[in-house]
Amino acid sequence: MAEDLEISKGSKEEQYENLLPQIEGLLTGENNQIANLANVTAALKEQFNFFWVGFYLVDTENELVLAPFQGPIACTRIRKGRGVCGTAWQQEKTLIVPDVEKFPGHIACSSLSKSEIVLPLYKQGNIIGVLDVDSDKLNSFDEIDEKYLTQILKLLDN
């Protein structure tokens, strides 16, 4: 349960290692996608204090729509190929952006966002959305985030 989330200190990798089984426990036995997406965003926000963490889900063949998130209000819709989220969706790959100001076509939902990682979310082999994580610091994301966030997203593919 959310109130039982154990926040850990230590290296980024140690924090993910501690969080991963807790997220798995939150998701076990719950089939409602919205509930699971909401709990994942809350757990990530609580553990890492990211500026913004949330999901965008495929709404039409060319547009993502905002889904559960934690953080300031956000862009509601993002077109395929636009910004970091739309590009990650179009390319079906993880994008790590050390400085969002240098990303061509970046959509500034908040001027406080400085770096970002976006990962595709799959269900039964089909991309159904993206996980978007923003930091208010430059160069916040790396291959450790990609590795563990990918593992978390695999838990949602049920």
Curated annotation (Swiss-Prot):
Originating species: Dictyostelium discoideum
GO cellular component, one term: cytosol
One term of GO molecular function: L-methionine-(R)-S-oxide reductase activity
Cystine pairings recorded for this chain: none
Protein name: GAF domain-containing protein A
Residue ranges constituting the GAF domain according to the UniProt record: 32-158
UniProt similarity note: Belongs to the free Met sulfoxide reductase family.
Alphabetized InterPro entries for the sequence: GAF, GAF-like_dom_sf, Phosphatase_reg/MetRdx
A Pfam family of this chain: GAF_2
